[in-house]
Amino acid sequence: MENIMNHGFIKVAAATPKIKVGDCSYNAKEICRLMDEVYEKGAQFVVFPELCITGYTCSDLFWQSTMLVAAKHGLRTIAEHSEGMEIIAIVGLPYIYGGKLYNVAAIIYNGEIQGMVPKSYLPNYSEFYEARHFTSGKDLESIYCEESDCGFSFGTNLIFKLSLIHISEPTRLDVI
């Protein structure tokens, strides 16, 4: 079968895991299972829903340190699982930076967290109360975060240069 990357295309998948609200360990395993499934079908990029590691409806639990630590652990589990895989994954979780809570999309590739992009426009109507819990990333300067075991870019204006090497000619993919 011919690789579509040779024609400038990549196969992108959108995956929705069956999650348990607040059970970050279970949700991370489900995300890893789906990542394997789409990877086996040839996807080179997979996007998961916002806050998929914790669940969207955690409300005030988003501020609990136990939840935030579990979400980070789930993110690391997913990142470690991706090592050796030629797939870019985007997953959602709550993340505290500078004392503020953000709803972020984490970009994972080959075992590493490449960066996090905070949500800029937070709905605050009907059943959506995101502004109650999260801070908008709209005016946030892009920076480089140092965690205890990794570093990554954080902000809304990030460009990643990732090499997809499993094709006949290595291709650079700019993810904006």
What are these regions (language model features)?
Residues D36-E146:
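Cys-nucleophile CN-hydrolase/nitrilase-fold catalytic domain and related Cys-dependent amidase chemistry
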Residues I143-S163:
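Accessory alpha-helical/coil subdomains and C-terminal extensions
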